[in-house]
């Protein structure tokens, strides 16, 4: 009897019923995530992916070893290293000479230090006041660098390394060619030209330490204070301005010591008088006063120049402040500064600009180079007088509080602006009255000091000390002591104490933040989305690995055979082919698949058999 073929309607109903049953069974098995693809679909996608990325895969052959070594030394990925080599090749094509592998990117040129406000006493006070709030150490003159012929750079530095560069120019402008003789003035405290200031200073390595303070004083005497207000006087450590009028300035030293010379043929416009004036009193009381820590014998003999008849306007007074004034008066030095006129110095007018030198060490009397006894003018030596009276030494007029207050307010208002502007702005144009530069340089220390390379320890040979784990069976090696201590405490002593509370998971971790990161898997929240295809992920590193499927980047590569992959797990699985036989001691109860670790079995069961209840 012939078999009757099934009717098409019944076959369609049976097919529909089977699909519905399959959907119900799939819905019953589905616990989380997207449904799994069939084996045929997975194989088809795998084949398409291989065809897609085989085109981009590059086999290095014999050059694989040098490539891996170059990548390890540079710390770059394969894509970045290849892009760098391609850029070098393009540069060679565009006209640069040399081989691509010999070309090194040029280092950016260091920006030259620009000179700003020359010899500006206001900036010195600003830097000193700001440095006093930042650092407990007192700055001193550390170096005089006569690198250029036009100016000498004075470096003020404290014990903490904070530096302040000051370019000391000659107070006078360069003279005309019709007066060549007036260009050469003695290199003492009389600064007649830029040649005198630069020739009078030498490097620190060519002179003994005893003469360095004297050299420093001679070079610092070439300052021309560019006070914004044009007033003369003393600016104290607290920023108080004390003006005074100069009537007559007389200085004396030991008999027979040459102090200055008045070259023949030089007119009054070729000379500038610089006088050292000691301050007879400390400004302020209590701790923090001017030079409170300086001993009485700190100031010895003072090198001073004599006032010359026909002194030109613009001459300056260098004030050497310190409590050793009594020692100076005991040596017979008399300096009379008062109001009035009638002396040769009265041609200066009512005001004479002055500069201040703080923290002055013991000064020794030295003879300037190139100064001859035979060429000294007897009239200049005759103007030096020796007297013992202390009453007529030095007169200071204290300014009233109402007149001091606006200057203090102005100085306080300009401190933060100048400090930040000089540290950041380099392209500002200078006023015509300011000849050159004072550079404000205080390195700002970080508020919270970072760990010095994570507590790395150097041995006697200057090499990094390696810390090997002392526990048996553990081959971990660390270069940072903190990392080594964390490994011993967490892995070998404390262990994995943080357990996942999710039912059926039970995974353990060393730290709470690791457990917190793991709990995102169970939450189902996918906050990391691919911009190209819109696929979402639970972790950021999963998204980064997925992006490589769009870019074709395979940054990981086997050092033995050259196999390239996108993620670390694939490389770890691949490396098992090159190692000894791995023991798969753990088997899945549902499908019989074997694993190396028990945690792998648990993860496989949760993902592949979600309907199975673990015992």
UniProtKB/Swiss-Prot annotation:
The gene is Znf653. It is found in: Nucleus. Residues 1-46, 93-115, 174-235 are annotated as: Disordered. Residues 7-25, 192-203, 212-232 have a biased composition (Low complexity). This is Zinc finger protein 653. Residues 106-115 have a biased composition (Basic residues). Highly expressed in testis and spleen. Moderately expressed in lung, adrenal gland, uterus, and ovary. Very low expression in pancreas, heart, skeletal muscle, adipose tissue, kidney, and liver. PANTHER family: ZINC FINGER PROTEIN (PTHR46179), ZINC FINGER PROTEIN 653 (PTHR46179:SF9). Gene3D superfamilies: Classic Zinc Finger. SMART domains: ZnF_C2H2. Pfam families: zf-C2H2. Transcriptional repressor. May repress NR5A1, PPARG, NR1H3, NR4A2, ESR1 and NR3C1 transcriptional activity. The keyword Zinc-finger applies. PROSITE patterns: ZINC_FINGER_C2H2_1 (PS00028), ZINC_FINGER_C2H2_2 (PS50157). GO terms for biological process: extracellular negative regulation of signal transduction; negative regulation of transcription by RNA polymerase II.
């Amino acid at each position: 009897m012939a078999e009757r073929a099934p009717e098409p309607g019944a076959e369609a109903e049976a097919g529909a019923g089977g699909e519905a049953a399959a959907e119900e069974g799939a819905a019953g098995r589905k616990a989380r995530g997207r449904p799994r693809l069939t084996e045929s679909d997975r194989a088809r996608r795998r084949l398409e992916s291989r065809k897609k990325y085989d085109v981009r895969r590059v086999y290095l052959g014999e050059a694989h070893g040098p490539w891996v070594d170059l990548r390890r030394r540079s710390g770059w990925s394969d894509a970045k290293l290849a892009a760098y080599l391609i850029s070098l090749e393009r540069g060679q094509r565009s006209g640069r000479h040399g081989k691509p592998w010999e070309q090194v990117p040029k280092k950016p040129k260091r920006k030259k230090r620009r000179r700003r406000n020359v010899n500006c006493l206001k900036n010195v006070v600003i830097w000193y006041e700001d440095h006093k709030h930042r650092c407990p150490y007192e700055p001193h003159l550390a170096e005089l660098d006569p690198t250029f012929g036009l100016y000498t750079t004075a470096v003020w530095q404290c014990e903490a390394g904070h530096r302040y560069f000051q370019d000391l120019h000659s107070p006078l402008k360069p003279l005309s060619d019709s007066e060549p003789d007036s260009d050469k003035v003695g290199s003492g405290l009389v600064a007649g030209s830029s040649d005198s200031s630069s020739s009078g200073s030498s490097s620190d390595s060519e002179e003994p330490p005893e003469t360095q303070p004297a050299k420093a004083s001679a070079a610092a005497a070439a300052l021309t204070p560019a006070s914004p207000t044009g007033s003369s006087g003393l600016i104290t450590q607290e920023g108080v301005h004390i003006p005074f009028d100069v009537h007559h300035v007389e200085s004396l030293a030991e008999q027979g010591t040459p102090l200055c010379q008045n070259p023949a043929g030089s007119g009054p416009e070729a000379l500038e008088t610089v006088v050292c004036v000691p301050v007879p009193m400390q400004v302020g009381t209590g701790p923090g006063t001017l030079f409170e820590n300086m001993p009485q014998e700190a100031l010895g003999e003072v090198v001073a120049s004599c006032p010359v008849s026909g002194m030109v306007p613009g001459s300056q007074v260098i004030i050497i402040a310190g409590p050793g004034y009594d020692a100076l008066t005991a040596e017979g030095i008399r300096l009379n500064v008062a109001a009035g006129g009638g002396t040769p110095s009265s041609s200066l007018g009512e005001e004479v600009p002055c500069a201040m030198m703080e923290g002055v060490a013991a000064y020794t009397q030295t003879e300037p180079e190139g100064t001859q006894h035979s060429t000294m003018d007897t009239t200049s030596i005759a103007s030096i007088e020796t007297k013992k009276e202390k009453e007529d030494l030095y007169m200071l007029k204290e300014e009233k509080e109402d007149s001091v207050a606006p200057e203090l307010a102005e100085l306080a208002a300009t401190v933060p602006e100048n400090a930040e502007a000089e540290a950041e702005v380099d392209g500002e144009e200078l006023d015509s009255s300011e000849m050159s530069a004072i550079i404000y340089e205080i390195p700002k220390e970080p508020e919270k000091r970072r760990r010095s390379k994570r507590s790395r320890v150097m041995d006697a040979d200057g090499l990094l000390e390696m810390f090997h784990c002392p526990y048996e069976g553990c081959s971990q090696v660390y270069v940072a002591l903190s990392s080594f201590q964390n490994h011993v405490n967490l892995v070998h002593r404390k262990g994995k104490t943080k357990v996942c509370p999710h039912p059926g998971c039970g995974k353990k971790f060393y730290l709470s933040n690791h457990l917190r990161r793991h709990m995102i898997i169970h939450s189902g929240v996918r906050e990391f989305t691919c911009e190209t295809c819109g696929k979402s992920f639970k972790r950021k590193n999963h998204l980064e690995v997925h992006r490589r499927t769009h870019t074709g980047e395979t940054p990981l590569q086997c050092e033995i055979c050259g196999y390239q992959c996108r993620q670390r797990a694939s490389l770890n699985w691949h490396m098992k082919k090159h190692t000894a036989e791995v023991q798969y001691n753990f088997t899945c109860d549902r499908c019989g698949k074997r694993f190396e670790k028990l945690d792998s079995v648990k993860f496989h069961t949760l993902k592949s058999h979600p309907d199975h209840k673990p015992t």
